[in-house]
């Protein structure tokens, strides 16, 4: 079972819900829920086959890119810097699973 992957998916999902409650951004909520579900699906696939990292890798790369750009513009650690950093760590972890 890919507990780290499921934890990452839960963090993204609950982070989008928390952000919606705090700021009220519906597009951000929808995008966060979609990406969180996609990360959860990727963790499910990794749980069944350790080498099946395509969905998880795509999701982490997508989030690292989007949130990295947001962090570069805003210079704010929360939430963009945190999510970009966690996504980069997920990418590293998934690449190591392939070795």
From Swiss-Prot:
InterPro entries named among the record's database cross-references: TMEM14 (IPR005349), TMEM14_sf (IPR044890)
Annotated compartments: Mitochondrion membrane; Endoplasmic reticulum membrane
Residue ranges crossing the lipid bilayer per the database entry: 1-21, 24-44, 79-99
Membrane topology (UniProt): Multi-pass membrane protein
An annotated GO cellular component: mitochondrial membrane
Keyword Thylakoid among UniProt keywords: no
GO biological process: apoptotic process; negative regulation of apoptotic process; negative regulation of mitochondrial outer membrane permeabilization involved in apoptotic signaling pathway; regulation of heme biosynthetic process
Keywords, ordered alphabetically: Apoptosis, Endoplasmic reticulum, Membrane, Mitochondrion, Transmembrane, Transmembrane helix
Top-level taxon of origin: Eukaryota
Tissue: Expressed at significantly higher levels in ovarian cancer tissues than in normal tissues (at protein level).
Pfam families named in the record: Tmemb_14
Family: Belongs to the TMEM14 family.
Functional note: Inhibits apoptosis via negative regulation of the mitochondrial outer membrane permeabilization involved in apoptotic signaling pathway.
This protein's name: Transmembrane protein 14A
Species of origin: Homo sapiens
Higher taxonomy: Eukaryota, Metazoa, Chordata, Craniata, Vertebrata
Gene: TMEM14A
């Amino acid at each position: 079972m890919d507990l780290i992957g499921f934890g990452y998916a839960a963090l993204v999902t609950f982070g989008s819900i928390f952000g919606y409650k705090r700021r009220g951004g519906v597009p951000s909520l929808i995008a966060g829920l979609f990406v969180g579900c996609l990360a959860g699906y990727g963790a499910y696939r990794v749980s069944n086959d350790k080498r099946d990292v395509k969905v998880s890798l795509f999701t982490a790369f997508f989030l690292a890119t989007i949130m990295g750009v947001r962090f570069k513009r805003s210079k704010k650690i929360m939430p963009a810097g945190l999510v970009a950093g966690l996504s980069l760590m997920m990418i590293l972890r998934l690449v190591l699973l392939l070795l």
